[in-house]
């Protein structure tokens, strides 16, 4: 283990007891516990137990929390993929199986503790994820590159940790996000596939993807998206309905039509309503030219239907590069 270097105003020298030093000296695991009572500002405590949290001041005046047994509190950022079919959503719910609670069970099995986790999004029941990001603080010697394998051994097959890294102490997976990208999958065929019907919405009528693409471009930019917001949204209640979509496009591969949206944030059911509106355009019931008027109306009834959750995937979350630097 690398020794810790701290600046102390008064300290016991590790090379000679009774000598007082100023500035900095090295603290090794062997001397840390035995010399602790001589120099740690324990706020009234005289002899902390091994493994107890203590506060140590460094020479810049910052406070660093460390465990006596040599553990360090680190902020971990993980990337997850999950099948949302059997979950009530990501967020912990009082009556229902959530992705967050299931993940915390695995954390407790691996770390011996149950840290709070901060998810990048509150995906709804039945929504899937290809690149969900979450972070948590934990005291552990397990290096981040070994966390995926360790956690996956305790997770059900429909949740997988894909990657892990450390990030700055104040990093928050939700608030630090720059953009989030969602994918909505449509099976454009009269007959369902027996293999992956849980991962798309079937639209039997042939869709005009070129018209849908033209309409998708009307959503790009900064707009008030209240017309694409489901009832019960707290953002709508507070008048916070302006968002910026940086990319929105429609592609077809055979019978599969994909709608991909990237934005700085979303309203409740916004992507599912946007996808439903584009399907109305693809079916000829709306035109691309109607989209600006629908947005300007701020009227939910003028937009398309809310498509089912099962076709929606959180594809990826992007952060400013400096935010992900440990």
What do these predicted regions represent?
Residues 23-39, 43, 61, 65-68:
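N-terminal, intrinsically disordered charge-dense segments
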Residues 23, 50-52, 70:
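Generic short amphipathic/hydrophobic targeting helices enriched at N-termini
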Residues 70-326:
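Structured-RNA-binding interfaces characteristic of tRNA pseudouridine synthases
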Residues 13-14, 64:
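Flexible loop/turn and low-complexity linker elements, especially glycine-anchored beta turns
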Residues 1, 16-18, 38, 43-46, ...:
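Glycine-biased, low-complexity coil/linker segments
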């Amino acid at each position: 283990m690398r020794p810790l270097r701290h600046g102390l105003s008064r300290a016991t020298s590790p090379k000679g007891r009774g000598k007082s030093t100023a500035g900095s000296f090295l603290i090794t695991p062997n001397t840390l516990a035995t010399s602790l009572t001589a120099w740690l500002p324990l706020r009234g405590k005289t002899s902390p137990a091994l493994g107890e949290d203590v506060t140590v001041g460094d020479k810049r005046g910052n406070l660093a929390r460390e465990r006596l047994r040599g553990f360090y509190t680190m902020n971990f950022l993980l990337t997850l993929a999950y099948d949302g079919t059997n979950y009530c959503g990501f967020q912990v719910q009082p009556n229902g199986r959530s992705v967050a609670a299931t993940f915390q069970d695995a954390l407790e099995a691996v770390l011996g503790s149950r840290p709070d986790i901060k998810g990048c999004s509150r995906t709804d029941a039945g929504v899937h994820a290809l690149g969900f990001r979450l972070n948590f603080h934990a005291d552990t010697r397990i290096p981040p590159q070994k966390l995926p394998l360790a956690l996956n051994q305790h997770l059900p097959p429909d949740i997988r940790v894909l990657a892990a890294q450390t990030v700055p102490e104040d990093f928050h997976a939700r608030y630090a996000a720059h953009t989030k990208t969602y994918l909505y999958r449509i099976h454009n065929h009269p007959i369902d596939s027996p293999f992956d019907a849980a991962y798309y919405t079937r639209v039997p009528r042939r869709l005009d993807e070129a018209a849908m693409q033209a309409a998708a471009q009307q959503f790009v930019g900064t707009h008030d998206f209240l017309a694409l917001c489901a009832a019960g949204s707290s953002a709508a209640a507070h008048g916070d309905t302006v968002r910026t979509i940086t990319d929105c496009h429609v592609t077809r591969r055979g019978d599969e039509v994909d709608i991909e949206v990237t934005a700085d944030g979303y309203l409740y059911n916004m992507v599912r309503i946007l996808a439903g509106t584009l399907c109305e355009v693809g079916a000829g019931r709306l035109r691309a030219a109607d989209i600006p008027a629908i947005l300007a109306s701020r009227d939910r009834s003028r937009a398309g239907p809310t498509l089912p959750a099962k076709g929606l995937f959180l594809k990826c979350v992007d952060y400013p590069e400096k935010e992900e630097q440990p």
